[in-house]
Design a protein with these regions (language model features):
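Flexible "arm" and connector segments at domain edges
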Residues: 1-65, 69-95
Length: 95
């Protein structure tokens, strides 16, 4: 059940990013990130740093990890990097 929910959540996030990219919604934070690659890049860097701090301080780790996932997925989509291709690359690296 947990695995199903994880995959479902990830698929929904990817679907949201692609829907917002093809049909922008005014005022959407996701659309703001998709349309401003510089902002999207800055947010990925910021969120990774916040995650590192959270891990070191043992505080808010899950929240910050979720922020990293979200912002990275949006950054990839904004730059036309398909998550399927990333997953395929990871699959090739299995030993």
């Amino acid at each position: 059940l947990l695995e199903f929910n994880m995959l479902n959540t990830l698929e929904n996030l990817i679907k949201l990013a692609r829907e917002r990219k093809s049909s922008p919604v005014e005022g959407s934070y996701t659309n703001k990130l998709l349309s401003d690659k510089s902002l999207s890049k800055a947010k990925v860097l910021e969120e990774v740093n916040e995650l590192i701090e959270a891990v070191e301080e043992n505080s808010n780790k899950i929240h910050e990890a979720a922020d990293v996932f979200y912002h990275l997925l949006i950054y990839l989509e904004a730059n036309d990097i398909k998550i399927e291709e990333v997953m395929s690359e990871l699959e090739k690296r299995k030993k």
